[in-house]
């Protein structure tokens, strides 16, 4: 698979990590602390993906 640019690559890798975390969460076998940690990781990944999308838009507009 080719990537148009570095931002697309980063977004794809973050989405892959997000998918792995969600697959772990839906198994329902986590202790409370691990569940909270993974939920926080999801929030961080979503924030990072939003920042990447914002940066890509700003770069297009220049």
Where are these regions (language model features)?
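Short, charge-rich amphipathic interface segments used for partner binding and complex assembly
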Residues: 23, 27-60
């Amino acid at each position: 698979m080719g990537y148009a640019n570095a931002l697309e690559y980063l977004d794809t890798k973050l989405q892959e990590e997000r998918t792995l975390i969600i697959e772990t969460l839906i198994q329902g076998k986590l202790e409370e602390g691990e569940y909270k940690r993974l939920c926080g990781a999801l929030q961080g990944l979503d924030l990072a993906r939003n920042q990447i999308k914002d940066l890509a838009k700003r770069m297009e507009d220049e």
